[in-house]
């Protein structure tokens, strides 16, 4: 066994029939494989789409709805039906399942993040399989493209998983679209997610799902930066989950960073909302970018926005305007403006423990989080 704690993300296209409705046969097959992995000693979390697919026909819709309010209503009905399918099938294998519905706020708010982490830890320690989904009935923003790709990466980072598996209807990341380009080549191992790789991903997904390959690259970036390797592979083949757990089926493996971001750094990079901007001189920029130093008041050039002690701000280099990163400040903007007027400004504005460096590509990639 190569992994002990695995997060599987199963998308809508991997759970539905041709008409967009939930396929009970596909759910049963997924739970069969989960049960075998569970018996082998793996700790498992399933991030599952499919609530809308499970519920829309019960409300009289002839096909999967497109309006947000109709999606929300369908998800409200379908979430219970979807969980019932998972619960019934897993109970036949004497395995307890548990439902957890999350929104972005559960990650952005530190207290709620801690509560979610503790609940998941207890469930895993007790041998249950948490089944996680976006709370689609209330979380409008989470109905955007790629929500559960992102969610699975956030969960994998939260529980410090050994592997995140993104199951989809294609068998990995290609150099081009394999359905239109016969010369497209699958990338089997990715050591670093570059801007070129992001450009390759492009595109959107199928009509039933909401996740394209670009959203999976975002998810892979978040997870690998947090120390979790990611495997993208097809769910269409027999024993897809079993083979993915061993990384033996065709797919694309994204290697984790050797030193994954700790929880505080993850929060700064992916969830903390910036309340202001600080511009620094070249010396301070070099200290932040290349030397791992704290930001001192003496390096400040200008301050804008409205922020207080412990708020998060974005820091830029004066002149070039290049983003340097984000951090939690030790002074509010009014105090900093007063310090800038001083002849000899002193003090630490952002300690290096409260700082995360960001490239322009990473900042753009996570702008929607």
UniProtKB/Swiss-Prot annotation:
Pfam families xref list? AA_kinase, PUA
Q: Binding positions for ATP?
A: 9, 168-169, 210-216
Ranges for domain PUA: 275-355
Catalytically driven reaction(s): L-glutamate + ATP = L-glutamyl 5-phosphate + ADP
Instruction: Tell me the enzyme class.
Output: transferase
**Top-level taxon in the UniProt lineage:** Bacteria
Signal sequence segment: none
Q: Name one GO cellular component term.
A: cytosol
According to its UniProt record, the EC number is 2.7.2.11
Is Iron one of the keywords? no
Quote the pathway field: Amino-acid biosynthesis; L-proline biosynthesis; L-glutamate 5-semialdehyde from L-glutamate: step 1/2
Q: InterPro entries from the xrefs? A: AceGlu_kinase-like_sf, Asp/Glu/Uridylate_kinase, G5K_ProB, Glu/AcGlu_kinase, Glu_5kinase, Glu_5kinase/COase_Synthase, Glutamate_5-kinase_CS, PUA
Q: Does the keyword 4Fe-4S apply?
A: no
Positions with a binding annotation for substrate: 49, 136, 148
* Subcellular location, record wording: Cytoplasm
Give GO BP annotations, semicolon-separated.
L-proline biosynthetic process
User: GO MF terms on file?
Assistant: ATP binding; glutamate 5-kinase activity; RNA binding
Q: Which UniProt keywords apply?
A: Amino-acid biosynthesis, ATP-binding, Cytoplasm, Kinase, Nucleotide-binding, Proline biosynthesis, Transferase
PANTHER family, per the entry: GLUTAMATE 5-KINASE, ISOPENTENYL PHOSPHATE KINASE
Q: What function does the entry list?
A: Catalyzes the transfer of a phosphate group to glutamate to form L-glutamate 5-phosphate.
Q: Which family does the UniProt entry place this protein in?
A: Belongs to the glutamate 5-kinase family.
- Name of protein: Glutamate 5-kinase
């Amino acid at each position: 066994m190569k992994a002990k704690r695995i997060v599987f993300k199963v998308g809508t296209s991997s759970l539905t029939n041709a008409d967009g409705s939930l396929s009970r046969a596909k759910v049963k097959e997924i739970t069969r494989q989960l049960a075998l992995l569970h018996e082998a000693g793996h700790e498992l979390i399933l991030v599952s789409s499919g609530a809308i697919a499970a519920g829309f026909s019960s409300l009289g819709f002839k096909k999967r709805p497109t309006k947000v309010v109709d999606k929300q209503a369908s998800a409200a009905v379908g979430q219970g039906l979807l969980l019932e399918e998972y619960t019934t099938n897993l109970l036949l294998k004497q395995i307890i399942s548990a439902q957890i519905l999350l929104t972005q706020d559960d990650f952005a708010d530190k207290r709620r993040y801690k509560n979610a982490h503790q609940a998941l830890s207890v469930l895993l320690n007790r041998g249950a399989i948490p089944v996680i989904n976006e709370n689609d009935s209330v979380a409008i923003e989470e109905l955007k493209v790629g929500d559960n790709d992102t969610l699975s990466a956030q969960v994998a980072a939260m529980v410090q998983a050994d592997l995140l598996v993104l199951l989809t209807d294609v068998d990995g990341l290609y150099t081009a679209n394999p359905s239109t380009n016969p010369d497209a080549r699958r990338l089997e191992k990715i050591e670093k997610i570059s801007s070129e790789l992001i450009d390759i991903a492009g595109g959107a997904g199928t009509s039933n799902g909401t996740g394209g390959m670009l959203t999976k690259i975002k998810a892979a970036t978040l997870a690998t930066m947090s120390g979790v390797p990611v495997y993208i592979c097809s769910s269409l083949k027999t024993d897809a989950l079993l083979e993915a757990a061993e990384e033996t089926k065709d797919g694309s493996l994204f290697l984790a960073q050797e030193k994954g971001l700790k929880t505080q750094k993850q929060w700064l990079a992916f969830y903390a909302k910036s309340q202001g901007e600080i511009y620094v001189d070249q010396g301070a920029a070099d200290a932040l970018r290349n030397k791992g130093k704290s930001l001192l008041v003496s390096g400040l050039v200008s301050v804008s926005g409205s922020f207080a002690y412990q708020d998060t701000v974005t820091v830029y280099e004066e002149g070039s305007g290049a983003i340097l990163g984000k951090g939690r400040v030790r002074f509010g903007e009014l105090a900093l403006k007063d310090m800038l007027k001083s002849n000899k400004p002193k003090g630490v504005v952002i300690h290096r423990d409260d700082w995360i460096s960001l490239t322009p590509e990473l900042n753009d990639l996570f702008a929607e989080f």
